[in-house]
A protein has these predicted regions:
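N-terminal secretory/membrane targeting signals
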Residues: 14-38
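Single conserved hydrophobic/aromatic residue that forms the stacking wall/gate
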Residues: 313-324
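Metal/cofactor- and membrane transport-associated sequence elements
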Residues: 38-226, 237-251, 255-285, 289, ...
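Specific transmembrane alpha-helix
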Residues: 290-295, 315
Length: 324
């Protein structure tokens, strides 16, 4: 006669119930699969997934503010680091307030084919029919607005005082960028003319670049950067304050671009949408890597540079590759 073994009995019982669980799970997912094949995703589910795409992509783009701060701080002289950090924190704060106060409705309150929206604060008018929440759209568009001003910050590094910079940040993020952005994304006259901009190559980067160019022309070259004769040949590059900090900024920006471009799909509620987002991620990574290789090749052809000098040329190149 076999002696009673509690462990053996317990093992038999566990195997028995595990079998029931696995069988039930298989039956459940079998019927669920049949139901999925026969039905489409509801509008509410699409609304949720689209909203999450906006929010998560916005988080990544917001992180680019840290990337710009690190990249600029690492490449300027040590005496300018604190000013660079203050300007980047300030511009992001100003962008958030101004885009809420007036910017969003200047962009999205434009009549069809028109030129300018309304001078009113943002308000939540979310509806299931839009496909995503208004709040998530506001957040996603706001971080784009801040990025536009970050372009200006890098160009005018070490040549503008903080308070004039903050004043211009309020004007750009509250009025200039929202109005020009609304001409296409807000259904304005550029949209009516057939112009298309998927992820801001014109509306964000050309607008920020034009503002930065205007500022550079007004302010002139930074002291000691070019020869006294006014020639275009640059003098020896400044000693960067921290190459590791600049490198960290490069990778933060690289990461943020996945949200910038991937979120511009504006939808993730269908198989086609999520597949498109994955393709955008791949293209973004290839563009950034290609930009680095191109910049490294060109800088090597120009001069036999030291490693840190080569980095001065290649550090912005992932951004340049993605933008192009």
């Amino acid at each position: 006669e076999t002696a009673y073994n509690p462990s053996l009995t317990k093992g038999v019982i566990m195997k028995k119930y595990l079998g029931y669980f696995l069988a039930g799970t298989a039956i459940y997912f079998g019927f669920a699969g049949l139901g999925y094949a026969e039905t489409t995703v509801s509008a509410e589910v699409q609304y949720i997934f689209n909203t999450l795409l906006f929010l998560m992509s916005g988080f990544l783009v917001m992180w680019m503010a840290a990337g710009f701060a690190m990249l600029e701080s690492g490449l300027v002289t040590s005496k300018s680091v604190s000013a660079i950090c203050a300007k980047n924190i300030g511009l992001y704060s100003i962008a958030g307030v101004m885009f809420w106060l007036v910017g969003y409705n200047l962009a999205y309150g434009i009549p069809e084919g028109g030129y300018i929206g309304s001078f009113t604060p943002w308000s939540d008018n979310s509806a299931l029919e839009t496909g995503y929440s208004d709040g998530s759209d506001w957040f996603f568009q706001m971080v784009f607005c801040a990025t536009t001003m970050s372009i200006v910050s890098g160009t005018l590094a070490e040549r503008i005082k903080i308070w004039p910079f903050f004043l211009f940040a309020a004007i750009l993020t509250g009025f200039i960028y929202p109005i020009s952005m609304g001409w296409q994304w807000g259904g304005g006259w550029l949209s009516a003319a057939g112009f298309s901009d998927f992820a801001g190559s014109t509306l964000v980067h050309a607008a920020g670049g034009a503002a930065a160019l205007a500022g550079a022309i007004v302010l002139g070259a930074r002291t000691g950067r070019f020869s006294s004769s006014g020639g275009v040949k640059a003098m020896t590059p400044f000693a960067a304050s921290s190459i590791p900090l600049a490198t960290l900024g490069v990778f933060i920006l690289w990461l943020g671009w996945f949200g910038f471009n991937g979120g511009s799909q504006l939808a993730s509620g269908t198989l086609e949408d999520v597949s498109s987002v994955a393709t955008i991620y791949i293209n973004t990574n290839l563009a950034a890597g290609g930009g680095v290789l191109a910049a490294a090749t060109v800088s090597s052809l120009e001069t036999v540079a030291a490693a840190n000098t080569c980095l001065l040329y290649t550090s912005p190149s992932p951004r340049d590759g993605v933008q192009s």
